[in-house]
Curated annotation (Swiss-Prot):
Coiled coil: none annotated. Disulfide bonds: none annotated. Seems to be required for the assembly of the photosystem I complex. InterPro entries: PSI_Ycf4_assembly. This is Photosystem I assembly protein Ycf4. NCBIfam families: PRK02542.1 (NF002712). It is a multi-pass membrane protein.
Length: 184
């Protein structure tokens, strides 16, 4: 969702609460739980998963390996669920021509730097930079080039914007801020 007027442009950024992240976390949790249950079943010599017929899986080496994969998968799944619940990467970009200020806010991981807040003047912006890399791993990213601070990304690398969409967004933002565009 975006909000624009003549002097203020606010763009909300989606964080880690995407449908694909929910799907991956859920699939990974179920798969790793299955691996762990099969490993524990082989250790105990009982069938803990009643949906499947009992299979003879020796604890050494198959049961140990499956238990290890199950535990590792549960750790990765819990990491994904934590990033989803904390909504890491979400935030907003606010461009205020009236005040002459640009504010970029993102949520991070819990701790000292949970809130990432950047504020700078519009007159310090050199240009809007578009980075286009085509090939197997396409990369289309929009940056703000700031004097003394380098380039700050405005779009995520996994947004999968088409070249037309990224150019349109860059042109609208450059027109709104009255700054030039650079293409790399």
């Amino acid at each position: 969702m975006n909000w624009r007027s003549k002097r203020i442009w606010i763009e909300l950024i989606t964080g880690s609460r995407k449908i694909s992240n929910f799907c991956w976390a859920f699939i990974l949790f179920l798969g790793s739980l299955g691996f762990l249950l099969v490993g524990i079943s082989s250790y105990l010599g009982r069938n803990l998963i009643s949906l499947f017929p009992p299979q003879q899986i020796l604890f050494f080496p198959q049961g140990i390996v499956m238990s290890f994969y199950g535990i590792a998968g549960l750790f990765i799944s819990s990491y994904l669920w934590c990033t989803i619940s904390w909504n890491v990467g979400s935030g907003y970009d606010r461009f205020d021509r009236k005040e002459g200020i640009v504010c970029i806010f993102r949520w991070g991981f819990p701790g000292k730097n949970r809130r990432i807040f950047l504020r700078f003047l519009i007159k310090d912006i050199q240009s809007i930079r578009i980075e286009l890399k085509e090939g197997i791993y396409t990369r289309r990213v929009l940056y703000l080039e700031i004097r003394g601070q380098g380039a700050i990304p405005l779009t995520r690398t996994d947004d999968n914007l088409t070249p037309r969409e990224i150019e349109q967004k860059a042109a609208e933002l450059a027109y709104f801020l009255r700054i030039p565009i650079e293409v790399f």
